[in-house]
């Protein structure tokens, strides 16, 4: 087909389109918005910020979005580990919406009957509330407030667990985060009101998640995955990232052998502190989790006929698989 007949939203030009040219075509109102605030995008460089939105991963789940190791837990949406390195944004939104609907269907057909031991659950809940209450009382005496503790963890994650990674930085970050988490369990972080108490409890969860994530990233780098997705791995023996960048910016190239594999991380716990808090297992330089790669689940090769598939749906057989 001649190029002139292909619908195209951009001006046809023999030269590559610049960002401002694309913006003039796609969303000229944005240019005017900046002009209204004294910024001319045609003349001034625009500072950009980088976020780790596509640092994908999540809880392992079945094709019905049920956790593979915690029955009756349904991690739906971007908390699910089905979001891969190169997934498009539309599929992520679709997975959340369709996943919630499918999970609700599965729950209605498989878990409609009451299965909770109320007495045992109440006893466990009371024990946990007692533990957390003790921790919160302990935390009031801490000389570190929850805001400072949170910021230290966030800065470390942005520096080591985002788009630019290196093994030496990750080694240090894992050790620092393990120390932070152990101190957090022993001493807590101070707060001044009920909202601060909630945030202090969030610090426990966030720091544990940060530690587990950093350990998983370190394992991936050690395994030789290389630079892929939304992260580059700095390597002095790697390839030059760009001719205008110095030797600091040499990166480990992607190892394509990992494209059909998924990294699985399983957390371990050992003893508890007197307050009931879970302690890390072993030395802080060792993972409190195990990591391994397994093959991605293949897309099923199905030759179902409509009549049989519809019958299986009507009779509820689909919820048995």
Positions of the model-derived regions?
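Mobile, glycine/GP-rich and aromatic-enriched active-site lid/loop segments adjacent to catalytic centers
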Residues: 1-87, 170-321
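Electropositive phosphate-/nucleotide-binding environments in soluble metabolic enzymes
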Residues: 24, 28, 94-98, 147, ...
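Secondary-structure transition/capping motifs at alpha-helix termini
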Residues: 66-68, 109-114
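A conserved FAD-binding loop/helix module that cradles the flavin
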Residues: 82-107
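Long, amphipathic alpha-helical stalk/connector segments used for oligomerization, subunit docking
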Residues: 112-195
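Generic, well-ordered alpha-helical scaffold segments in large soluble proteins
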Residues: 33-37, 102-110, 135, 156
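Sequence-pattern detector for short linear motifs
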Residues: 90, 131, 153, 158-162, ...
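Short, surface-exposed, charged/polar-biased interaction segments
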Residues: 51, 94-97, 114, 121
């Amino acid at each position: 087909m001649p190029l002139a007949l292909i619908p195209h939203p951009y001006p046809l030009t023999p030269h590559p389109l610049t960002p401002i040219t694309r913006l003039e075509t796609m969303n000229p109102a944005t240019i005017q918005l900046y002009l209204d605030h004294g910024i001319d995008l045609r003349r001034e460089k625009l500072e950009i910020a980088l976020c780790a939105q596509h640092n994908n991963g999540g809880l392992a789940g079945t094709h019905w979005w049920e956790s593979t190791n915690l029955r009756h837990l349904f991690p739906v949406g971007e908390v699910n580990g089905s979001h891969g390195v190169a997934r498009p944004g539309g599929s992520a939104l679709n997975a959340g919406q369709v996943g919630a609907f499918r999970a609700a269907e599965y729950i209605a057909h498989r878990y409609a009957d009451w299965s909770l031991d109320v007495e045992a659950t109440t006893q466990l809940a009371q024990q946990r509330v007692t533990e957390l209450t003790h921790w919160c009382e302990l935390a009031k005496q801490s000389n570190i407030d929850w805001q400072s503790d949170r910021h230290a963890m966030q800065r470390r994650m942005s520096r080591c667990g985002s788009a630019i990674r290196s093994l030496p930085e990750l080694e240090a970050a894992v050790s620092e985060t393990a120390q932070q988490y152990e101190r957090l369990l022993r001493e807590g972080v101070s707060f001044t009101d009920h909202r601060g108490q909630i945030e202090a409890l969030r610090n426990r969860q966030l720091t544990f998640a940060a530690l587990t994530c950093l350990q998983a990233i370190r394992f991936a780098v050690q395994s030789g995955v290389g630079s892929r997705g939304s992260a580059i791995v700095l390597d002095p023996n790697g390839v030059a990232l760009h001719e205008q960048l110095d030797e600091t910016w040499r990166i480990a190239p992607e190892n394509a052998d990992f494209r059909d594999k998924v990294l699985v991380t399983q957390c371990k716990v050992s003893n508890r502190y007197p307050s009931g808090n879970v302690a890390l297992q072993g030395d802080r330089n060792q993972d409190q989790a195990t990591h391994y790669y397994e093959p991605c689940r293949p897309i099923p090769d199905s030759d179902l006929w409509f009549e049989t598939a519809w019958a299986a749906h009507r009779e509820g057989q689909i919820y048995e698989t």
